[in-house]
Every structure is written in structure tokens, then in C-alpha cells.
Amino acid sequence: MPLPDRTAEAVHGSAPTNPLDWAAQAREADMPSLVREALQRDRAQLAFQPVVTAGSPPQVAFYEGFIRLLDPAGRVLPAGDFMGHVEETALGRDLDCASLRLGLQMLRRHPSIRLAINMSARSIGDGAWRRVLDAGLAPGVGERLILEISEGSAMLLPEVVTRFMAEMQPKGVSFAMDDFGAGLIAFRHLKDFLFDCVKIDRHFVAGIESSPDNQVLAEALITVAHQFEMFAVAEGVETEAEARHLRALGVD
């Protein structure tokens, strides 16, 4: 999709009059260039979030690594600012490569951690991404790598994803499904997929202690996960009340 023509907007008088708004629009329009430059200049890094068990005391089961980029001034570009501009382009595959490379480096440096890295179904057919993966699966690394793919992405190419899982799991690699229950998954595919873990979509988690609908849906998703011997994780737990109710429903 072509970027908006800011010059044309200025001619017709629809450009913002506030300099800060103008700067924000210009930055947004130039986001693909910012992403490209950040990758070329090695200004990519991972932010880490722990995933903890529901037991008492809670323990870190693994960490999630999220790609972050720095602008020329060293400020962090939140993923929400740039991902929508590039995720369906070649730059999106470059981001996947950078994320995987950084994750594998972290696993080599810290032999006691497990780490989940995001990928997409399209990454499987990307030669550069596969070379990064194959080169980084040193002994002891594959067993601690979790590749995380969204429910929607998995359903785009289910046969490709299934074959890739069958190839990687003998090497110790685990797989997690993100956004489980978001609405695209056909449950008949679950018996074919080889996911080790599912992450229940945050929409079923928010305010669950006071939402009968979310309680029923979350319990159903947890039951499905356990039926297929998958570890059930709840996304976006923010309060103790949510955590307490999810523990009662059987989340792992």
C-alpha cells in the first residue's frame, strides 16, 4: 500500500497545524525507513517478560522475548508503532530473523533459561530465517527454545506449520500458540498440530472474576488444551483476582 502523500495534504490544507502533530505524522509515514535503518545499524534488542506457573510459590517457566527497535536518538520504538507497517512485508521477515538471532544468542549466553520467540507461518519458507535457525540450534539450545506462532498465522498455512513442527520437535524445539481462542482455529486441526503450549487470548482473561462468559470460555479452552496435553497459559493477567480465578479453573 503506498504511503500517504503528506505534500498533497499540505497543498489541500488538511495537514496538521500543530508542529508536534506534524512530526508524529511524518514519523509514522517514515516508519518502514526507520525499521530498515534500525536493522541495518544493529539497533534491535529483545525485551523480556517472564511467564510464571500458577502454583505456589510461582516459578518462572520461561521468558518471552519481544523485538524492540531504537531510533537514531536511542529511544525505543514500541512494537505497536512499527509492526503494523511492516509485518506483511519483507521487513517483517527481517524482523523475525533479528528476533530469532537475538533469542538464540541469549540462550547460548544463559544456559539456565528457556525463551519463547515470535515467528509467523511465512517465516518457515524464508531462507534467511531458516539459516539463522539451523545455524543456532547448537546442542543444549534447541531444548530451551520455544517458537511462538499466533493462532491466525498457524491457520494460514496449517499443513506447512505441521510439517515444520514435526521437523523441529525431534531437535528439542517446543511450540506455543499465541491468541488461543481468538476465533480462527478449527479445533479439528489441534490433533494435527503439535503445540506444547497454548496462550489463552487476553480477551477471555480480563476481568474474568466478574465475567461469567469469560469464565465459561476460559474453562473450555483450558479443558481443550489439557485434553491435547498442552500447557495452558493465560495472557495479560494483571490482577490477583484474575490470577486466583484462573488458578481455580486449572490454568498451568
List each model region and its residues:
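Cyclic nucleotide signaling catalytic output domains
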Residues: M1-D30, L34, D81, H85, ...
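Active-site core of bacterial EAL-family cyclic-dinucleotide phosphodiesterase domains
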Residues: P16-M83, N118, M177
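Signal-transducing alpha-helical linker
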Residues: A23, R27-D30, E87, L91-D96, ...
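Catalytic core of bacterial c-di-GMP phosphodiesterases, primarily the EAL and HD-GYP domains
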Residues: Q59-E64, L91-V160, G236
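Conserved long alpha-helical elements within nucleotide-processing catalytic cores of c-di-GMP signaling
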Residues: G80-G84, R93, A166
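Charged helix-capping and loop-helix junction motifs
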Residues: R130-D134, V160-F164, P212-E219
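The catalytic core of metal-dependent phosphodiesterases that act on cyclic dinucleotides
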Residues: G136-I208, V224-D252
